[in-house]
């Protein structure tokens, strides 16, 4: 298929460039002794997740859907945050998250 035959809009991901950037991030991770957390807000292109999974060991989730996506596609630790937790959702977040951030002590 020629590029002008592909329906638009579309995204082109150059795997070599993605890997080069992930290698740089991985180097920073090693040299600084930190953990890199992938944010779905920065990249929601789920077809890249198998590659990202090779480099990132954690991800963020600002919703239950993002938490489930992280668990299903990345299978790593999930750092969750939410503007408001309900009695129902807090238990779901507790079951699927490795870390939970609260906006205030009152939210606890």
Ranges and model annotations:
Residues 34-108:
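Active-site-proximal beta-alpha core segment in soluble small-molecule metabolic enzymes
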């Amino acid at each position: 298929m020629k590029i002008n035959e592909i329906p638009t809009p579309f995204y082109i991901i150059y795997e070599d460039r993605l890997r080069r950037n992930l290698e740089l991030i991985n180097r920073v991770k090693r040299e600084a002794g930190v953990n890199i957390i992938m944010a779905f807000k920065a990249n929601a292109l789920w077809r890249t997740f198998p590659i990202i999974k090779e480099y990132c060991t954690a991800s963020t989730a600002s919703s239950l859907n993002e938490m489930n996506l992280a668990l299903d596609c990345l299978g790593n630790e999930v750092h969750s945050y939410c503007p408001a937790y309900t009695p129902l959702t807090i238990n779901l977040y507790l079951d699927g998250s490795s870390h939970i951030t609260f906006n205030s002590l009152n939210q606890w």
